[in-house]
Amino acid sequence: SVTGYSDAATQLMNDIGLNEDFLNFMDTSTSEDLALVGNFDANNGVALPGAGDHFMYAGNWNATMFGGEGYEQVIESLPLPSGEKEKLIAFWGGKRDFLEGLSLSEKWDYLNSVSYNQFLIDKVGLLPTTVPILNAIIVHLSGMTGWNLTVGEALLGGASGITSLGWLGKATASAGGAFLDRLLKIRMFPDGNASVARLLVQKLIPNVAPEVRGPANIVAARFNYDALDQASNNTRLRLNSTAVGVRENELGTVEIDYVEQDSPKRVIADHCILACYNGLIPHLCPEMPEPQKAGLAYGVKTPFVYANVQVRNGKAFSKAGATLFQCPYDPFQWVSCAPTVAVGGFEPPRRPDDPMVIFMMHSPMPMTKPDPKLSTRDQLRLARTEIYQAQFSDYEQQIREQLQSMLGQFGFQHQSDIEAITVNRIPHGYAYPYVKLDDPEWEAGQAPHEIGRAQFGRISIANSDSEAVALMNAAFDAAYRAVEEQTA
């Protein structure tokens, strides 16, 4: 959505056809029962391991976590100790102030200095084994857990409990509500933001797909990759070319060394924008000042694993009763039907008899309390290492076991029903956002990403890392700034 976008980002969206009219069309083309796009009225559930198969609740789990209608009955049905159920009912009901006894300033300090999970254990009284149930939504939206975020950060990021903090919580609830409102405005192409990248490329190099009529048929359009790097193009895009060195020479031009098909090559340009992972830039451009290199190296991207599982039909998933399940105790914490969006020339499956794709998300961040000596950045590095060390066979086994336990009770047989699995390891995912438990509050202009993105002669820095915001519009804003720097 363009809501909240800068003028530059909004103009870019309009230039590639993603204006308000088309976004409204996307709304009408998205299935109303698709919870993945933030439709909190759609059936969404929770899956908890049981003695045999998973316990599956399908209704409105998100509403339950915020004290929605019937939340007490839902909690009573969960396979949890009776004492834990009572605590969840009290916490989600919003009828009690769990920071009672603290002054307003003490509450504010608590919200900004104690982790969400520690709050759940110390103040709400939950057992550590129950805490993951309240973490699944945080993991999906931030890639971190309630051990990494303060109470305030977690609540403003969509976690439950904001109405259980007395007057301060109710005053803060409007900010949390604004966050949920933004969730409700999510628009999604069937291939995610890949369609946006394809629209940008086609706008710059029309011959790559002359038949494209903007976003209306971008998903199904075939691209001619041979047209990307033609000398006659105003814009050239060179694939399979890994940059290994960038420097401004004594002639006032920029030399970019790269490797293409094991062959070292060099291109010379008047200007260069490094729109890549910030952590790589000190290695690409070692001539930069040490403080700038330190700023670039500070952030650690949040790792994820996304899996898509093609199954023979959607009968078992349909019988489960929801389009999305939170799975707090499983390797893949979110399991959903893939985006059922009829847009861009793509026609999704619509009936249970049709083949379907199940989308699964795994965060490797520890759900149990981490070593207090490890900062969030340390934990992100360890999580990244876990992804690198895992084999496809490891993920395949996890996927098969989890889906069988969840859907077997509805007739699913993983041996015959799964037709294909793709696993997308994303060791360098979301831009690092800073967390209050670990990072100081820097003065304006002195945060590591701000120092790191300083113009370095004819070289400028872009990408969402340079904004410390893991959103597409942040990358647009960074690109605009970098181009403005080099054309001023």
Predicted regions and their residues:
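Active-site/ligand-binding neighborhood in enzyme catalytic cores
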Residues: 83-241
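Charged, often glycine-rich, active-site loop that binds/positions anionic groups
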Residues: 36-54, 224-233, 239-247, 255-257, ...
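Conserved beta-strand->loop/alpha-helix structural units within folded catalytic cores of enzymes
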Residues: 3-12, 18-24, 112-116, 122-127, ...
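Active-site rim elements
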Residues: 1-3, 102-110, 182-191, 292-298, ...
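N-terminal glycine-rich phosphate/pyrophosphate-binding loop and immediately adjacent elements
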Residues: 1-109
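Mid-domain catalytic core of redox enzymes
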Residues: 231, 235, 239-369
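Short, solvent-exposed loop/turn and secondary-structure capping segments
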Residues: 133, 148-153, 167-170, 283-287, ...
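Conserved flavin/dinucleotide-binding core of flavoenzymes
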Residues: 49-51, 259, 310, 316-488
